[in-house]
Amino acid sequence: KKEGYLVGNDGCKYSCFTRPAQYCVHECELRKGTDGYCYAWLACYCYNMPDHVRTWSRATNRCGS
């Protein structure tokens, strides 16, 4: 199992700045995670997801490129 920031097809973290309070929890559960939250009101962070779920990494960041 892994944890981390959800990543969209564009390589960017899932934004939650203007989303409802339960948005990240729902998105994490859709990916079989057990919980999640909106970190600093900026991006969705998830816990206990399957290892195959893509998460953001500084080393592989391609957001904005």
UniProtKB/Swiss-Prot annotation:
One GO term describing the cellular component: extracellular region
Subcellular location, in the record's words?
Secreted
Check the record and name the InterPro entries matching this protein. LCN-type_CS_alpha_beta_dom, Scorpion_toxin-like, Scorpion_toxin-like_sf, Scorpion_toxinL, Scorpion_toxinL/defensin
User: From which domain of life does this come?
Assistant: Eukaryota
Family per similarity comment: Belongs to the long (4 C-C) scorpion toxin superfamily. Sodium channel inhibitor family.
Protein function: Beta toxins bind voltage-independently at site-4 of sodium channels (Nav) and shift the voltage of activation toward more negative potentials thereby affecting sodium channel activation and promoting spontaneous and repetitive firing. This toxin is lethal to mice.
Give the protein name, as stated in the record: Beta-mammal toxin Tpa2
Q: Which organism is it from?
A: Tityus pachyurus (Colombian scorpion)
